[in-house]
Amino acid sequence: QIARMDKTQFVVYVARLFSRKGYAVKLTPVADNYCIDMLVEKQGTITAVSVVQSTGLLGKNDVACVCEGRRHYPANNAMVLTNSYYDSSAVDYAREHGLALVDHNVLASQYMA
């Protein structure tokens, strides 16, 4: 089902998943959003979320723009969420910069369950 969605459909789908988990969700503008697709808030903590739909592994460059992007929003944390997986360079970069990474397995087990 997710594989057939376009980017906008996937972002809306993820927003609904967050809403069902009790988050307040605010979608950012489609253009000029600094790689941040939505802000999610729960218990006073705001997370800037980048939603990446991909058929291949995501690398460092795929997650790096989120570090810069979160500075443009009132967010405490940042997350990259994908229907795919991350390579080791993305994982290392995220660890260094305090980014949360959600891959296909985590998406299926923690958000879609």
Show which residues each predicted segment covers.
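Mixed-charge (Asp/Glu-Lys/Arg
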Residues: 1-113
